[in-house]
Curated annotation (Swiss-Prot):
It comes from Homo sapiens. Belongs to the mitochondrial carrier (TC 2.A.29) family. One of its GO terms (cellular component) is mitochondrial inner membrane. This is Mitochondrial S-adenosylmethionine carrier protein. It catalyses: S-adenosyl-L-homocysteine(out) + S-adenosyl-L-methionine(in) = S-adenosyl-L-homocysteine(in) + S-adenosyl-L-methionine(out). It is found in: Mitochondrion inner membrane. Mitochondrial S-adenosyl-L-methionine/S-adenosyl-L-homocysteine antiporter. Mediates the exchange of cytosolic S-adenosyl-L-methionine, the predominant methyl-group donor for macromolecule methylation processes, for mitochondrial S-adenosylhomocysteine(SAH), a by-product of methylation reactions. It is linked to Combined oxidative phosphorylation deficiency 28: An autosomal recessive mitochondrial disorder characterized by decreased activities of respiratory chain enzymes, and variable clinical manifestations. Clinical features include episodic metabolic decompensation beginning in infancy, mild muscle weakness, cardiorespiratory insufficiency, developmental delay, or even death.
Length: 274
């Protein structure tokens, strides 16, 4: 990948990430509180809906930028084989690699954010300090495995579906999709991926919010899912599915649309620059 492409992916990914995380933060808070062990009301209900937003604001740009740099680089690296039937597989591999890298940044931000969302009266920096004091760096990476196990299946569904919908729309209208059309494809892809991966999101939330030293905090996703199934059934496994779908559908519209638009503009500026 050349330097203009690298810079375009870096900036476009970061801009898209910040836009989505800040605009849709209230929906994310509602989803987290619905999935929390203490239940929606005890976790804060609709009070302090922006609790934890500083953590999201700090982490969103580098997280999204890291994802898209990796995603675009792996797509470029695999481009040597132009077989069209392998294209979805390339997108899956690129998205999976992007998630593994991005989660190194996302998880600490997410841990602090989610604990703030269910403890609205506690300041974000205090939560960050408490985690470091009580659990060390390991505490900030609580749920890394469960986050990766959530994000990779999500990306395996979302990104190939997004790319396929764009390709189909481009073929139908005989020219490359516009930014708004890319955003619509992103909304459909994101909403569908969000729905089918909600149980993994529930497990990840429970692990992140668990008390240090508890069995849930160990991070065994299957064990957590089994526990939720036994205590709450299917409703527990899909807790927060509608706000999650709404947030990620809107997020897909904004995120992927903003990414495509910003990426195209930056590449165009790069071509015009001497």
């Amino acid at each position: 990948m050349d330097r203009p492409g690298f810079v375009a992916a870096l900036v476009a990914g970061g801009v898209a990430g910040v836009s989505v995380d800040l605009i849709l933060f209230p929906l994310d808070t509602i989803k987290t509180r619905l999935q929390s062990p203490q239940g929606f009301s005890k976790a804060g209900g609709f009070h302090g809906i922006y609790a934890g937003v500083p953590s999201a604001a700090i982490g969103s740009f580098p997280n999204a930028a890291a994802f898209f740099i990796t995603y675009e680089y792996v797509k470029w690296f695999l481009h040597a084989d132009s077989s069209s039937y392998l294209t979805p597989m390339k997108h899956m591999l690129a998205a999976s690699a992007g998630e593994v890298v991005a989660c190194l940044i996302r998880v600490p931000s997410e841990v602090v954010k989610q604990r703030a969302q269910v403890s609205a009266s506690t300041r974000t920096f205090q939560i960050f300090s408490n985690i470091l004091y009580e659990e060390g760096i390991q505490g900030l990476y609580r749920g890394y495995k469960s986050t990766v196990l959530r994000e990779i299946p999500f990306s395996l569904v979302q990104f190939p579906l997004w790319e396929s919908l764009k390709a189909l729309w481009s073929w139908r209208q005989d020219h490359v999709v516009d930014s708004w059309q890319s955003a619509v494809c992103g909304a459909f892809a994101g909403g569908f991926a969000a729905a089918v991966t909600t149980p993994l999101d529930v497990a990840k939330t429970r692990i992140t919010l668990a008390k240090a030293g508890s069995s849930t905090a160990d991070g065994n996703v299957l064990s957590v899912l089994h526990g939720v199934w036994r205590s709450q059934g299917l409703a527990g496994l899909f807790a927060g599915v509608f706000p999650r779908m709404a947030a990620i559908s809107l997020g897909g519209f904004i995120f992927l649309g903003a990414y495509d638009r910003t990426h195209s503009l930056l590449l165009e500026v790069g071509r015009k620059s001497p």
